Amino acid sequence: MSKNLLTFEDVSVNFTQEEWQWLSDTQRDLYRKVTLENYKSLVSLGIPVYKPAVISLLEQGKDPWMVQKKGARDTCPDWQYVFKGTEFISKQDIYKESAKVLTMGRSHFSSSLDCPDLKEDHENEDWFKNRLGRQEVHSHQLFITHKEVPESEIRGCNPSCQAVHQNAILDVPQCSSTKERIDQSEPQKRSYRKKSVEMKHKKVQVEKRILKCSECEKVFNQTSSLTLHQRIHTGEKPYACVECGKAFSQSANLAQHKRIHTGEKPYECKECRKAFSQNAHLAQHQRVHTGEKPYQCKECKKAFSQIAHLTQHQRIHTGERPFECIECGKAFSNGSFLAQHQRIHTGEKPYVCHVCGKAFSHRGYLIVHQRIHTGERPYECKECRKSFSQYAHLSQHQRVHTGEKPYECKVCRKAFSQVAYLDQHQRVHTGEKPYECAECRKAFSNSSSLAQHQRSHTGEKPYICKECRKTFSQNAGLAQHQRIHTGEKPYECNICGKAFSYSGSLTLHQRIHTGERPYECKDCRKSFRQRAHLAHHEKVHTMESFLSLSSPSPSMSSQLPRTLGLIS
């Protein structure tokens, strides 16, 4: 029989009134429980099931025994039995099973043990619970009474089995005696206590058989779980994002993904009020506060708060790089690095700032960028209490206090605290300017200079002073401006102790002590401490050239030396 044609009758057992009277209260409770569970299981599997009368009786707390119809065969109604076969069985097997059932009602119960086919049944657990526990998908349904086994067919059995069948048939009239019926029930009552384990085991087998993946044999408790699992094998992804078209196999995954576009973060940390789009991310974050690191590397004993971080770390020891770019063949130790790298080829920038609309290829870049708008600086220096928006910037800053300059130029031996500064410096020697403005084709030696330059075309000024709302195109410009409000003068002259708010002002001041005049006029070889003074001086020569062409008066010529004397 097909699994789809499973019916309530296939997993049910009916009792007559007299049969029901034989059962103890415990056995009746077990019958009620199993029968109701079977019915609920069929309904939960989506199988169309009418509500049988026995279910209605059980739900109302009434006895579920069935009335024996008049005019039935002259057999003991107590032995009316529904036999459920689990396979396509032969007639001989049918008679063997029938013999087991029929013999159990006899007063000479022990004589049936001579048949080897019946010994197993008596050695097993409770016959009653076996009846309730037959819940496999059945292929035969046989209604058997004492007199339904033709004598001619019994001849196919072995002699001991034939005796059992003969005795079972001949002794049927004895069941009409109340005393004999009570005597006969004693072996059954003793046998009833044995098969609850088998019944429950068979029930689980049915559910597993119905909810098993045909590809990998994995078993599930619910059809919905099986359906979701099978999409792993089929690759089906029926849930698509209307924003970006990305598809998912589960609706829950789509719901999580949508929060990237909406910015929704419903899960908030009670410690720091930081919010997350997924509950799992919140659970991981909370380990920052608790310090819990349950995942430890067996090689170096380093511990991690997330198992994914441990997995990635272990690839340092193994050298494994399983994620390879199909475009350029570059390999990575984890999938997120590969995904980020592939955006170089695709140009994809899925992370958009909701304030200014700027897009980024990495989520981390967006988070750092958003701190420009919020002013958040979560990383603080313990030495000077200065705070930073990025941890990398804090690490770089701390070298100011330690004096560490680990990056040295091989050409001039100049050392730097940051590798980026070394890279920029080396372009002084090479003359390389790899960053070119698409608007005016002007080239720069570093990307930050290009980014700052491009704002001259766009007019963008993303850095806002919270005090006076003045805007700036560069963060450095904002930082300098804020010292007007704070009165901070961090740059102090080592010679005279005078302090300045800008490093450039200190540099100019120190030239007074050193006598340095780095800006020289090409016309008269006169030198100046500041570029602005040189530019002003050069206008004098421009004026002289103009006057010589127009024959200036002696009075105007006499004023030129006085003007030159002012700019020294």
Swiss-Prot record:
Location (main, coarse): nucleus
Species classification: Eukaryota, Metazoa, Chordata, Craniata, Vertebrata
Protein name, as recorded: Zinc finger protein 583
Gene Ontology MF: a single term: zinc ion binding
Cellular component aspect of the GO annotation: nucleus
Organism listed in the record: Mus musculus (Mouse)
UniProt keyword annotation of Zinc-finger present: yes
Keywords (A to Z) from UniProt: DNA-binding, Metal-binding, Nucleus, Repeat, Transcription, Transcription regulation, Zinc, Zinc-finger
InterPro entries: KRAB (IPR001909), KRAB_dom_sf (IPR036051), Krueppel_C2H2_ZnFinger (IPR050826), Znf_C2H2_sf (IPR036236), Znf_C2H2_type (IPR013087)
